[in-house]
Amino acid sequence: MDLDAIRAKVASGQYIVAFSHTEKLRRRRIRAQDIEEAVRLGAVIEDYPDDPRGASCLILGMAGRRPLHVVCGCLDAEEILIVTAYEPDPREWENDWKTRKKRF
């Protein structure tokens, strides 16, 4: 997915958060401003072009000093879908928050 296009849509408010995850975001204390900042400053670390729900990607960004993973998908030409956002779990991610730990 095109990060510049995602950033432009998020910056202009052309995004929605998946209804099924709004409560999870509230419990995780992740605000819309946190998502916007993470996308604005972040980088795509994984691409999911074959996602059955439609092409999506995983963005790593910072909200203040807090690392966030934001999963974005394409709804249509008008809006970006924020599928979910979460703090990466150190048991699953290396210290760079970009690299998944190897499972044995």
Roles of regions detected by a PLM:
Residues 1-104:
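Ribonuclease/tRNase effector modules and their secretory precursors
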